[in-house]
Amino acid sequence: FDTFGTKERLRGAPIDGEALVGLRSTLGPLVEVVSQEEEEATVRFAVWTALRPESANLTQFQLLEAKNVDEGVAVTSTWFGPSQNVVMADASGRIGWTISGFIPKRLGFDGSTPVPWSSDCRWDWGAQAPRPSVVDPESGVLFTANNRVAGWEYAPAIGENWDPGYRASRIRDLLAQKQEHDEQSLLDIALDTRVE
């Protein structure tokens, strides 16, 4: 274990009493001591890409320099931290969707339930799982509202529980009402709260 945290609050104001210091292992920060015996303890760690040191990168700003959707998708794969849906378009009218964030390969488990570190389950932090992307779909339309966009073959890497798609269906229907959209019509869609 090593320690992390600080004994000061924002702007250097000292804390009276308890210090904000935690314990961290190669897995991540310690979040709970489940049981403790004389020589053995059962503990829980938080293993999350946002808590990895390499997640504090700012490569998302390279999207500002991407010249087309292909470059945008490539830049997005280097943007670590928690995964996010990323939808993009370029000046030529091409569109794309992908997922940002580091997606480690899971070895020996699918991520749907917590696993003990003592098992054979591991994360390969040196290699990423296959990253889904959709570029220039036949429909000519991309939309996402935390619903499943990628095929089921990506479920072991990114998860199996998605929004049921009510909001995404509404967005699809509103997009279909016009052949072309501008900033105002897209803002209207974003602010729409109806579900039909």
Label for each model-derived stretch:
Residues 1-196:
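Mature extracytoplasmic enzyme cores
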